[in-house]
Amino acid sequence: MAKATTIKDAIRIFEERKSVVATEAEKVELHGMIPPIEKMDATLSTLKACKHLALSTNNIEKISSLSGMENLRILSLGRNLIKKIENLDAVADTLEELWISYNQIASLSGIEKLVNLRVLYMSNNKITNWGEIDKLAALDKLEDLLLAGNPLYNDYKENNATSEYRIEVVKRLPNLKKLDGMPVDVDEREQANVARGG
């Protein structure tokens, strides 16, 4: 079996493909490497100018090694093997968008540190209960959330109750503007307020 691509190798490939210097690039695309990247390592700390780091479609099991990336705004980790939201302290103040759909996340513990998060794409993970969604309530700026494809969502969908699901999410996260790609409408907001006792 082929050895995993290292971050260092992936950066070199990116530089060759795009004719750029990775340490100066605002968007660094290391997605879909063949063979896949398995580990985020300290080489990432050299990407000082990076605002958007794309690591989707690899075999990464753990979020790590983001210290030094003080300009990071968008972290794309969709289609990996990640089980936990962790090791984001270094980017907690700057990160605005976390794209982490198609992973194996069952808990949102740790997400509350991302105080400036506006966008969270985490469809097709393993979220099963409302207690996890409640952890998002600490994120005042969160306005765009993708949850479809999680067991929690699927339970409602199977019972033709997606409108109830939407109201339940908005009840818990009143600042949301968009849920699963659809704007939160006035009607949903009113019903959520009533359900909240407002």
From Swiss-Prot:
Residues 157-195 form the LRRCT domain. It comes from the Eukaryota. GO terms for cellular component: microtubule; motile cilium; outer dynein arm. Changing D185G: Reduces swimming velocity. InterPro entries: Leu-rich_rpt, Leu-rich_rpt_4, LRR_dom_sf. SMART domains: LRR_SD22 (SM00365). It holds the Pfam family LRR_4. Changing R196D: Reduces swimming velocity. It is found in: Cytoplasm, Cytoskeleton, Flagellum axoneme. Changing D185P: Reduces swimming velocity and beat frequency. The record marks M182, D185 as: Controls the orientation of the C-terminal helical region. Keywords: Cell projection, Cilium, Cytoplasm, Cytoskeleton, Dynein, Flagellum, Leucine-rich repeat, Microtubule, Motor protein, Repeat. LRR repeats lie at residues 49-70, 71-92, 94-115, 116-137. Belongs to the dynein light chain LC1-type family. Outer (ODAs) and inner (IDAs) dynein arms contain the molecular motors that generate the force to move cilia by ATP-dependent reactions. There are two mechanosensory systems that monitor and respond to the mechanical state (curvature) of the axoneme. One system involves the central pair microtubule complex and radial spokes and the second system involves the outer dynein arms. Interacts with OCAD2, a outer arm dynein heavy chain. Interacts with tubulin (previously called p45) located within the A-tubule of the outer doublets in a ATP-independent manner. Part of the multisubunit axonemal ATPase complexes that generate the force for flagellar motility and govern beat frequency. Component of the outer arm dynein (ODA). May be involved in a mechanosensory feedback mechanism controlling ODA activity based on external conformational cues by tethering the outer arm dynein heavy chain (ODA2) to the A-tubule of the outer doublet microtubules within the axoneme. This is Dynein axonemal light chain 1. It comes from Chlamydomonas reinhardtii.
